[in-house]
A protein has these predicted regions:
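Function-determining surface determinants
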Residues: 1-274
C-alpha cells in the first residue's frame, strides 16, 4: 500500500487550524471534523510505524485526549437527535427531561474540551510541527512505502480471525474496521467499494452503539414506572439497530475476511487498496 503525501499531511494541517480556532461551544460539524482528523492522524502514525519515535508518541498522547473529549461532546449531539426521532421536536414530558439532561451534559463536555485545547494548545503546535517534519522525512526516504503495509496487515489478520459476531464484541469489531478504513484512505488509489463497505459497517454499528449509550443514560434519568413507555421505545429501537448492525458486519466479514487463509485475505484486501 503506497501512501499518498497529500493524504498523509492533510490531518496535520487541519488539526493545527482547528485547534487554534476551536470556540468554547463548538458546532456539531466542528466537533465531528476535529474527531475525524485526530483519527486520521492516529491512522497515519500507525500506518507509517512511527509509534517507536518519542515525538510521535507524545503527539499521540495529546490527540487521544482531545479525541476522547470531543467524542463526549459528539455523543450528546447524537443522543439528543435520537430522542427527538422518537418523540418529535414537539416532545413529550419524559423526552423533554431527557433532552434537557443531555443538553446540560453537552455544555459541560464542550467546556471541558475547550479547556483542554486551550491548556495544551502550545504543546499541540510544537508536537504537530515536529511530527510533520518527521513524516516528511520518512516519506522522502521511502520508509513509509516499506513499512506502511504492516499495520493494515495486522488489522486484516485480526479481522480474519474474529470470533462469531455478537453484541459483546461488535463494538470492538467496529473500532478495528474504522482503523483499517482510515489507513486505506491514506491511499488515493484504494478501491472505493472496499472503503465504502468498511464505512457502512462503521456507521451502522456506531448507530446501534449510540442507542445503547442512550438507554444507559435514560435509565438513570427517567422513572421506570411513569416513563416506562419512552424507555421501552429506546430499548426496542436499540434492539432493531443491533440486528441491522450485526447483519452488515457479517456481510462484510463474509465478503472480505472470511477466507481459509488469513494471509490470502490480507493479500486480497491490500491489492484492492493499491
Amino acid at each position: 500500500m503506497k501512501l499518498q503525501p497529500d493524504q498523509v499531511e492533510k490531518p496535520l494541517r487541519k488539526l493545527r487550524m482547528q485547534l487554534n480556532a476551536l470556540p468554547p461551544n463548538p458546532r456539531p460539524e466542528e466537533v465531528h471534523s476535529l474527531r475525524m482528523y485526530t483519527r486520521r492522524l492516529e491512522a497515519t502514525i500507525a500506518a507509517m510505524a512511527l509509534e517507536r519515535e518519542k515525538k510521535a508518541r507524545c503527539l499521540l498522547k495529546l490527540i487521544k485526549s482531545v479525541r476522547k473529549a470531543a467524542g463526549e461532546v459528539r455523543d450528546m449531539d447524537v443522543l439528543i437527535g435520537n430522542v427527538l426521532t422518537i418523540c418529535g421536536h414537539q416532545g413529550c414530558g419524559p423526552a423533554v427531561r431527557l433532552v434537557e439532561h443531555l443538553a446540560k451534559m453537552r455544555v459541560r463536555n464542550a467546556r471541558r474540551l475547550h479547556r483542554l485545547v486551550r491548556r495544551e494548545r502550545r504543546e499541540f503546535s510544537t508536537r504537530l510541527k515536529q511530527s510533520s517534519r518527521l513524516i516528511r522525512k520518512k516519506m522522502k526516504n521511502g520508509v513509509a512505502d516499506r513499512e506502511g503495509e504492516t499495520p493494515p496487515q495486522i488489522l486484516i489478520t485480526e479481522l480474519s480471525h474474529w470470533p462469531s459476531l455478537d453484541e459483546g464484541n461488535l463494538h470492538l469489531f467496529r473500532i478495528r474496521v474504522k482503523e483499517l478504513r482510515y489507513m486505506l484512505q491514506l491511499n488515493e488509489q484504494a478501491d472505493a467499494r472496499l472503503v465504502d463497505a468498511l464505512g457502512e459497517v462503521k456507521d451502522t454499528v456506531g448507530e446501534w452503539h449510540d442507542w445503547v449509550e442512550l438507554e444507559k443514560i435514560a435509565r438513570k434519568v427517567l422513572d421506570p414506572r411513569s416513563d416506562g413507555d419512552l424507555l421501552k421505545r429506546i430499548r426496542l429501537t436499540g434492539g432493531e439497530k443491533l440486528q441491522i448492525a450485526l447483519a452488515a458486519a457479517i456481510r462484510l466479514r463474509e465478503r472480505y475476511f472470511h477466507l481459509p487463509d488469513a494471509r490470502k485475505a490480507g493479500v486480497k484486501i491490500l491489492q484492492m487498496a493499491s
